[in-house]
Amino acid sequence: MPNPRLCAAGVTLRDQVDRAFPNRDRRSDGWVGDSSHSARKSDHNPTAEGWVRAVDFDANLSDDPKASYVFANQLRLLARRDRRLSYCIYSGKIASRRTLWRWRKYTGVNPHNTHIHISFTKKGDKDGRPFDLAILKG
């Protein structure tokens, strides 16, 4: 199996977030799965080709406590037309194509209160175009 690598869409989004929030907390950031992820299906686990299709951002993006919700919500709305995005989880809610990108209660093990989880589709493996999100433009 090839070495794990974050999909191009994930790399681009991470770079955009880092530029928009250079002093943000990164303690809950991550992309490649740890041992708890490897025991179950997770987009943090590499595909057979080595692609990791998930990235987490610490919820403390800035001094504004609403910034993480605004970011997650803008991603959710963008995902209606950007097929690289698979789903978003934050603060006990999940949005995906299956629910027409409406927030619903997330019932998984981790409510994602300390970080925003974004999963990507296969289209994101090599498509690293920038994401058109107002919060990332300053």
Predicted regions and their residues:
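Secreted/periplasmic proteins that engage bacterial cell-wall peptidoglycan
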Residues: 1-100, 113-120
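Active-site or metal-binding loop neighborhoods of secreted/extracellular toxin and effector enzymes
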Residues: 106-138
